Amino acid sequence: MKRIPCIAIACLILTLSGCAVKSAADAETVCDPGSGPEPPQFCLTAELPAELQRSAEDSAEGRSVYTRAAGAYEVVIETAAGAPDAVLRQLTGRETAALDPVYLAWPQADQYQFAWTGADDEGALACCGTLLYDGTTCYTLPLRCAAELEKTYLGEFARILAHTRLTDAA
C-alpha cells in the first residue's frame, strides 16, 4: 500500500519538473543597447582667487578663461571629448610620456597632474595643470604664467589645483 503513494509522488515529480519558475538570473531579456541610463554629468569646480577676472567664455565649447590683473597668469577651465592622452597632447603640444603626469584614481574620475614649459610672443612660459577623466569627457584646468613669475605664484597654483574637483551637474 505504501508503494502506490511513493510511485504517484515519483511520477508527479518527473512530470512537473519542467514547470519550474525561472529566477531573475535565468530569465531572458531583450533590450536596446542604446537605451541605457544616461552617463552622469559633471562640472569642474575650482576655488579661484577673487582677484581673477573672467576674460573669455565660450559655453558652446565648454571653455572659460580667467586672468589675474595685469595678465600675471591665466587659468583656463575647459571640457573636451576624447582620451586623456589625446587631450593632453592637444593642450600641451607634448606626448603623455614626455609630460610624465602624476596619475591619481578617484571614484568619480581619473586625475592627471602635469607641468610643462612653453613660449609665446611675450617670452618663456611656466605651465601646470590637472585633467580629470570620467570615462567619456576630459575636464582640464591648465595655468600659464611668465617663467620669471612662476615662483611668485607657485603657492597659489598649488591651492587652485588642490581644490579642483568634479561635482554633479544636477
Describe these PLM feature segments:
Residues 2-64, 69-70, 144-170:
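N-terminal targeting sequences that direct proteins away from the cytosol to non-cytosolic compartments
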Residues 6-9, 81, 119, 132, ...:
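Serine/threonine-rich, low-complexity intrinsically disordered segments
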Residues 33-42, 80-90:
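Short, basic/low-complexity N-terminal boundary segments at the transition from targeting/disordered tails
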Residues 39-43, 70-74, 120-124, 136:
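Glycine-centered tight beta-turn/hairpin loop motif at sheet-sheet or coil-to-beta transitions
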Residues 63-89:
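A short acidic-to-branched-hydrophobic micro-motif
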Residues 82-84, 120-121, 146-149:
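Solvent-exposed loop/turn segments at secondary-structure junctions
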Residues 92-136:
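Signature of long, low-cysteine stretches enriched in small and polar/charged residues
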Residues 138-142:
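Short hydrophobic beta-strand segments that form the core of ligand-binding sensory/regulatory domains
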